[in-house]
């Protein structure tokens, strides 16, 4: 049985323009226009596919969104996700320069987080290609309790201000999720979005669209988030029986888990059993590890995921988080917050703490707190700077993204008018030649070669 899967991450970014005291800052719409000016200039649109096979566009609510090219390896996926940050950082530099030329005050910041000060939420959507065979309801039933409880390890952390005061939560998205499974993404915000757009052969595949997760700054957190989910899916697809872990009230559970830093908040299952998020994650870990090891197909990434999954749960059980304080986002952030609080004798509700929370997610390599920690070697990495830089210009070589990226590059170099999406490559000439690429695993295609040669 092949464990190869297509993955993709879509990340919506928060955007702001900090104006000097006493001056009116630009609105998010205005900042977005400056940010995408260069993109619109060459792409004639604020929705474009890039030479690296990825998609860059302006989403509703003026959120820049970057969707990685199709990846078939988790390390590759994280590399292309980080590459998106670098591409957007370049757009920020260009927009900043334009502001200064026009005498407009303010500094543009992009945040890879999931909530803004007005209480709006925007997402990090995970995409997993799954086989069409099998019961989707069963898949969702097994996956939802896993996705609700994984936040104890994969949450990005957040200072939540309530009428009762400020509190540190595990997840940024948890308070904004209202359903387990739905076809909407904004109105009801489900854990799993069921809108069926496989971007592949619909008879063979469907695209599982998970929208409950937090955006990850820490690369090992991203690896665990996607890697553990991938292995749970492998087990489900193989038909392995799983004890019923359905939650009595999933929406209450997701919030109660997020608001309890110990991972030990009691949650009630539909069966009446009372457990904790750590208990359920431990159950998934044991079951998944037994299954994956029994297949004999354990990759290096699988081993790293199991190691961090296990160490994270042990750390929560013991209350000593030092073993994961360089790898898990919320733990890294909580440590920063605690030290800053102690140094300056601050309450958690102090606005300076909220600014620190935000600065952790700033994608700037000179101002973002996470990136400054990474530059000083204070957090663990999965990728390298060289690979991330390469990913901004070169598509993954093992998936359909290679065909798209190469087509875009050659069409741009030949100054040809073209249209592309996830499955179509089209030259907008008299012949209107189009190639349909339905197989996301296919990186070589004679039809695409001929289309490129015809330029």
From Swiss-Prot:
ATP binds at residues 55, 68, 422. InterPro entries: Pup_ligase, Pup_ligase/deamidase. The keyword Glycoprotein does not apply. Pfam families: Pup_ligase. One of its GO terms (biological process) is proteasomal protein catabolic process. Its EC number is 6.3.1.19. Mg(2+) binds at residues 10, 57, 65. Pathway: Protein degradation; proteasomal Pup-dependent pathway; Protein modification; protein pupylation. The active site is at 59 (proton acceptor). Belongs to the Pup ligase/Pup deamidase family. Pup-conjugating enzyme subfamily. The keyword Chloroplast does not apply. The lineage of its organism: Bacteria, Bacillati, Actinomycetota, Actinomycetes, Micrococcales. GO terms for molecular function: ATP binding; ligase activity, forming carbon-nitrogen bonds; magnesium ion binding; ubiquitin-like protein transferase activity. NCBIfam families: pupylate_PafA. It catalyses: ATP + [prokaryotic ubiquitin-like protein]-L-glutamate + [protein]-L-lysine = ADP + phosphate + N(6)-([prokaryotic ubiquitin-like protein]-gamma-L-glutamyl)-[protein]-L-lysine. HAMAP family: Pup_ligase (MF_02111). Keywords: ATP-binding, Ligase, Magnesium, Metal-binding, Nucleotide-binding, Ubl conjugation pathway. Catalyzes the covalent attachment of the prokaryotic ubiquitin-like protein modifier Pup to the proteasomal substrate proteins, thereby targeting them for proteasomal degradation. This tagging system is termed pupylation. The ligation reaction involves the side-chain carboxylate of the C-terminal glutamate of Pup and the side-chain amino group of a substrate lysine. The reaction mechanism probably proceeds via the activation of Pup by phosphorylation of its C-terminal glutamate, which is then subject to nucleophilic attack by the substrate lysine, resulting in an isopeptide bond and the release of phosphate as a good leaving group. This is Pup--protein ligase.
């Amino acid at each position: 049985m092949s464990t190869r899967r297509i993955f993709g991450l879509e990340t919506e970014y928060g955007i702001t323009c900090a104006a000097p005291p006493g001056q009116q800052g630009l609105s998010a719409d205005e900042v977005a226009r400056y940010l995408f000016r260069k993109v619109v200039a060459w792409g004639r649109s604020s929705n474009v596919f890039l030479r690296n096979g990825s998609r860059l566009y302006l989403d509703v609510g003026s959120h820049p969104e970057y969707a990685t090219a199709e990846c078939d390896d988790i390390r590759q996926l994280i590399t292309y996700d980080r590459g998106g940050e670098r591409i957007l950082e370049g757009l920020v530099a260009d927009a900043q320069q334009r502001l200064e030329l026009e005498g407009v005050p303010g500094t543009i910041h992009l945040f890879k987080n999931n909530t803004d000060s007005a209480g709006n939420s925007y997402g990090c959507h995970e995409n997993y290609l799954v086989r069409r065979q099998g019961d989707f309801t069963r898949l969702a039933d097994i996956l939802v309790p896993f996705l609700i409880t994984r936040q104890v390890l994969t949450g990005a952390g957040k200072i939540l201000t309530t009428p009762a005061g400020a509190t540190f939560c595990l997840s940024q998205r948890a308070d904004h999720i209202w359903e387990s499974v739905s076809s909407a993404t904004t109105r009801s915000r489900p854990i799993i979005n069921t809108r069926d757009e496989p971007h592949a052969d619909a008879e063979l595949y469907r695209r599982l669209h998970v929208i409950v997760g937090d955006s990850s700054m820490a690369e090992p957190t991203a690896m665990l988030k996607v890697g553990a989910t991938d292995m749970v899916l492998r087990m489900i697809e193989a038909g392995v029986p799983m004890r019923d872990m359905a939650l009595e009230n999933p929406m209450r559970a997701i919030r109660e888990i997020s608001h309890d830093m110990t991972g030990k908040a009691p949650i009630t299952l539909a069966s009446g059993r009372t457990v904790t998020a750590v208990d359920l994650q431990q159950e998934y870990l044991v079951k998944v590890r037994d299954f994956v090891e029994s297949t004999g197909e354990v990759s290096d990434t699988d081993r790293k995921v199991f190691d961090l999954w296990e160490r994270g749960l042990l750390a929560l059980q013991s209350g000593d988080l030092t073993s994961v304080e360089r790898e898990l986002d919320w733990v890294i952030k909580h440590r920063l917050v605690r030290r800053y609080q102690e140094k300056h004798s601050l309450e958690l509700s102090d606005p300076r703490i909220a600014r620190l929370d935000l600065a952790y997610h700033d994608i700037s390599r000179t101002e973002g707190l996470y990136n400054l920690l990474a530059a000083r070697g204070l957090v663990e990495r999965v990728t390298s700077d060289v690979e991330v830089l390469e990913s901004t210009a070169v598509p993954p070589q093992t998936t359909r993204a290679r065909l798209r990226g190469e087509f875009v590059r050659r069409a741009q170099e030949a100054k040809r008018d073209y249209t592309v999406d996830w499955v179509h490559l089209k030259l907008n000439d008299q012949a209107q030649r189009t190639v349909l690429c339905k197989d996301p695993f296919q990186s070589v295609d004679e039809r695409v070669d001929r289309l490129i040669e015809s330029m």
